[in-house]
């Protein structure tokens, strides 16, 4: 079984009002074979993974949502990524796979729609090595 804590170790976080969005990006080659199989990911040197966990500020429970993610590379090429929901220990975790070149700056623009909350958008830049 996956562990959200393990996938989000060294993560970034964004305060989104009533909830916190915790995220992490990593090369798929950094995944254990067991985790890669669970995520249905074939590790490759040019594939990255993003994970997003949404936690209610009041009780830390994981929240379900609709997520829209747009990735821009250093050349300005934009692509919309499909975020898949997987259940991890009874909690929803959102994942997507993306292409990248080692050492390239990638801008992730994420919009999160949690029921009962206004949509929240934020950006962050990562470089995978």
Roles of regions detected by a PLM:
Residues 98-101, 108-120:
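Short, exposed beta-strand-loop hairpins at the edges of beta-sheets
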Residues 88-95:
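Aromatic sugar-binding surface patches on proteins
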Residues 9-49:
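Beta-strand-rich domain onsets/edges
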Residues 118-128:
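Edge beta-strands of extracellular beta-sandwich domains
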Residues 3-9:
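N-terminal signal peptide c-region/cleavage motif recognized by signal peptidases
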Residues 49-57, 95-97:
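Short edge beta-strand/loop segments characteristic of extracellular beta-sandwich folds
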Residues 59-68:
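Short flexible loop/turn segments that cap and initiate beta-strands
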Residues 68-82:
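Short amphipathic beta-strand segments in non-cytosolic proteins
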């Amino acid at each position: 079984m996956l562990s959200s804590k393990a996938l989000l170790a060294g993560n970034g976080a964004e305060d989104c009002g009533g909830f916190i969005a915790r995220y992490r990006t990593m090369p798929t080659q950094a995944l254990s074979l067991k985790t890669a199989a669970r995520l249905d990911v074939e590790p490759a040197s040019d594939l990255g993974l993003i994970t997003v966990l949404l936690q209610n500020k009041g009780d830390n429970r994981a929240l379900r949502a609709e997520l829209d993610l747009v990735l821009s590379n250093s050349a300005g090429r934009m692509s919309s990524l499909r975020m898949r929901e997987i259940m991890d220990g009874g909690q929803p975790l959102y994942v997507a796979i993306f292409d990248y070149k080692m050492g390239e700056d990638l801008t992730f623009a994420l919009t999160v729609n949690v029921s009962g909350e206004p949509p929240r958008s934020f950006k962050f830049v990562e470089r995978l090595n």
